[in-house]
């Protein structure tokens, strides 16, 4: 933390509270934690579930990460069509980095 000692358990509990209130940032950050193994054991399946919830609430970074997971088969089966859908959604939601990944997909086809 900033100005305080890091307490992953307390942060995790706050993110869970945020999720209970359908807070898209809470869903995204827990997805990130499970994707990268921050404060929790890495679990791509759980990461995907949290990213899906955040994406449902139009959180562009979560939509991008779902596209990434499908694009590269990171923790799930590779599916270029689903990757494209999520990258397009992220781009529509304002996440400009998705354009680069969409361009890569076009080259791969």
How would you name each of these model-derived features?
Residues 4, 27-36, 40, 63-72, ...:
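Hydrophobic face of amphipathic alpha-helices that form TPR/SEL1-like repeat modules
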Residues 1-2, 20-24, 36-38, 43, ...:
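Short helix-capping/linker turns of helical repeat alpha-solenoids
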Residues 79-96:
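TPR/TPR-like (Sel1-like) alpha-helical repeat modules
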């Amino acid at each position: 933390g900033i100005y305080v000692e890091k307490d992953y358990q307390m942060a995790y509990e706050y993110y869970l509270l945020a999720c209970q209130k359908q807070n898209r940032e809470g869903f995204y950050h827990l997805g990130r934690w499970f994707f990268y193994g921050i404060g929790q054991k890495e679990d791509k399946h759980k990461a995907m579930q949290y990213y899906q919830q955040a994406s449902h609430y139009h959180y562009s970074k979560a939509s991008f990460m779902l596209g990434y997971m499908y694009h590269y088969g990171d923790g799930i089966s590779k599916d270029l069509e689903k990757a494209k859908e999520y990258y397009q959604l992220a781009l529509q939601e304002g996440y400009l980095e998705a354009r680069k990944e969409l361009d890569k997909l076009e080259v791969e086809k």
